[in-house]
């Protein structure tokens, strides 16, 4: 095998305050480090959730990602949870809207989607 594991996933957000609040304060990611990159005029925030690292680049005025219709590239991030229903209730209590819960036709497991401040689809899956 060429690779041991995925080291990190990088996403781009457009609003520093909204993105950091969403991923850290609402979803519970831990900030590992945070840097302003003057040469690029953007921020890079390294986040951690369990064994997963997420690089959050904040690039003001970045073009919007096409979600509908879907474009090539990263489709979504998916988080494993013990209970989709309980997690949906918690997301709703935080003011985060979700799609209706459904059952994955191939795995038989419950799942649903919600969106980050820049409309990146995020999935929760049992």
Regions found by a protein language model. Name each.
Residues 11-53:
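Core segments of cupin and vicinal oxygen chelate
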Residues 32-34, 40-42, 56, 61-67, ...:
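A short, acidic/glycine-rich surface segment
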Residues 70-85:
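Mid-chain, well-packed structural core segment of small domains
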Residues 1-18, 74-77:
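N-terminal beta-strand motif that seeds the catalytic metal site of vicinal oxygen chelate
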Residues 50-54, 61-63, 84:
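Short, charged/polar surface micro-motifs in flexible loops or helix N-caps
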Residues 1-2, 46-48, 88-126:
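Vicinal oxygen chelate
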């Amino acid at each position: 095998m060429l690779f041991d594991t995925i080291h990190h996933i990088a996403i781009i957000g457009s609003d520093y305050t909204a993105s950091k609040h969403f991923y850290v304060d609402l979803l519970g990611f831990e900030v590992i480090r945070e840097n302003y990159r003057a040469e690029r005029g953007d921020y890079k925030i390294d986040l951690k959730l369990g064994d997963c690292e997420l690089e959050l680049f904040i690039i003001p005025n970045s073009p919007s990602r096409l979600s509908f219709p879907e474009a090539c590239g990263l489709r979504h991030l998916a988080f494993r949870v013990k209970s989709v229903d309980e997690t949906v209730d918690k997301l709703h209590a935080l003011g985060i809207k979700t799609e209706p819960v459904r059952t994955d036709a191939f795995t038989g497991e419950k799942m649903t989607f919600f969106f980050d401040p820049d409309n990146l689809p995020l999935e929760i899956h049992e």
